[in-house]
Design a protein with these regions (language model features):
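RNA-contacting regions in translation and RNA-metabolism proteins
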Residues: 1-353
Length: 353
């Protein structure tokens, strides 16, 4: 590429892609100096003068004026320096212009390649910055492909120039859901990782944060801070338990989340493909909180351990299986929700004591 072509290309990239000319020019200057050093062994100090007004690039090799030359790549004799200009003395630095033909050859061989590579780096950096600022937010993506072998889904996140591709792994999809190409789904942005092939956007649908953000979007009282989500325990695709608290005694936190005729919670259940959601009222009283967490089972008594976060819960005999849940799920989620180890016993066990 000729110099004027380089300037024209950078101006176009800044206008159409939003990539600054200074960023790209820095990449080009670095590539040109590296290429020259590679072709001229021993040369160390190479500078490129950028004249944006004249749309010119000029390359110089810098050498120090010395009495006795030991390294021709970095030094020049006083006589040679005086031949250029009588002003030079020992210790001065001389800028020796690189022949225009040679510089043109280097620019032609590296300019286009560097612009392409710099474009990739710049776009990669822009994608990283864009999505790194959206961590722990909900994004909407369109399924573009399903890998029939692994079940992984490729998604297009965002629109226009800000759109990027992301991979939703099979293990991070909601259990039991079947995704199809063209389907729009909500995902939760957990992390953005820098990788050689570009940023990796981590977007599971299994994270508890997805449920929290969905309620924030659906329930105005949560969005404005009147109702708080204190804790969430989730087994994606099956069941979620969520503890809520109201900062206004006139607002029922559970009712706010459920909504009129269950509209709010049902909307979220639909998004999560039928996942059951238990909403309980948070309490600062551990025993009361634990009892509520084991809903829908009734609790007769909660005995807290004297040390550590553990307890024994007594339930009616006919509700033992309900309290424990299928494959222990209800008890397991309750324990995670409240942060206590829970030992559930039937009422007959209490009588035997």
């Amino acid at each position: 590429m000729k110099c004027d072509e380089i300037f024209a290309a950078l101006a176009m990239l800044e206008k159409e892609r939003g990539i600054s000319q200074s960023f790209m020019m820095e990449k080009i200057v670095q590539a040109l100096t590296t290429a020259y050093k590679r072709d001229h062994e021993g040369v160390e100090n190479v500078v490129v003068d950028v004249d944006e007004g004249k749309r010119e690039l000029k390359m110089f090799v810098q050498k120090e004026v010395v009495d006795e030359v030991e390294n021709p790549g970095t030094q020049m004799s006083l006589d040679d320096a005086k031949a250029i200009s009588a002003k030079y003395n020992v210790g001065d630095i001389v800028n020796i212009p690189v022949d225009n033909i040679e510089f043109g050859r280097i620019a032609a061989g590296n300019g286009k390649q560097v612009i392409i590579q710099g474009l990739r780096e710049a776009e990669s950096g822009m994608v990283y910055d864009e999505y790194n600022s959206k961590q722990h937010e909900i994004l909407t993506g369109v399924v573009t492909r399903i890998d029939p072998r692994t079940g992984n889904a490729s998604l297009r996140i965002g629109t226009g120039t800000e759109a990027t591709d992301a991979l939703l792994l099979a293990g991070e999809q909601v259990k039991g859901e079947t995704l199809v190409e063209g389907q729009r789904i909500k995902v939760y942005l957990v992390d953005v990782r820098r990788q050689s092939r570009g940023p990796q956007v981590v977007i599971p649908r299994t994270h508890p944060g997805l449920v929290k953000r969905l309620f924030e979007l659906e329930v105005p009282e949560i969005y404005d801070g009147t109702v708080e989500i204190r804790s969430i325990a989730r087994e994606a695709g099956s069941r979620t338990k969520m503890a809520v608290w109201s900062n206004d005694e006139n607002v029922d936190p559970i009712g706010a989340c459920v909504g009129p005729h269950g509209q709010r919670v049902n909307s979220i259940v639909d998004e999560l493909r039928g996942e059951k959601i238990d909403i309980i009222k948070y309490s600062d009283d551990p025993a009361e909180y634990i009892a509520a967490a084991l809903a829908p089972a009734d609790v007769i008594d909660v005995r807290l351990a004297e040390e550590g976060k553990a307890c024994r819960v007594i339930v009616p005999d006919d509700q033992l299986s309900l309290a424990i849940g299928k494959e222990g799920q209800n008890a397991r989620l309750a324990a995670r929700l409240v942060g206590y180890k829970i030992d559930i016993k039937p009422e007959s066990y209490k009588e035997e004591e």
